[in-house]
Amino acid sequence: MSKFVIWTSELDSRLSKKYGRVVPRNLAVERPSIEEIEEAAKSLGFKVLQVEREKLNPKLSGIDEDLRTYGRIIIESPYGKAKTLKIIAQKIRELRRRR
């Protein structure tokens, strides 16, 4: 099992890769909240170790306040970080469709 940090900005479709988006834009979601990421991770069976709602990804310190998303979550997953992020992004899209 791998432990790693997931920043909300890594899943945000509004951001370029320069500012921290990791997943492809077609899989990313607009303005993902830390609560959505946590819910998706738990529903997928990943262990959530820590949630920090006020943290800002250092890559976002130089951009407009409108584009900043706060929060990071530390999880444990059997997959690598890139695959885990893609799975979580797909789950968030699914959860949003249900609402």
UniProtKB/Swiss-Prot annotation:
Key word Mitochondrion present: no
Main subcellular location: cytoplasm
Taxonomic superkingdom: Archaea
Compartments where found: Cytoplasm
InterPro entries named in the record: Signal_recog_particle_SRP19, SRP19-like_sf, SRP19_arc-type
Keyword set, alphabetical order: Cytoplasm, Ribonucleoprotein, RNA-binding, Signal recognition particle
GO cellular component: signal recognition particle
HAMAP family xref list: SRP19
UniProt record similarity statement: Belongs to the SRP19 family.
Protein name: Signal recognition particle 19 kDa protein
Organism placement in taxonomy: Archaea, Methanobacteriati, Methanobacteriota, Thermococci, Thermococcales
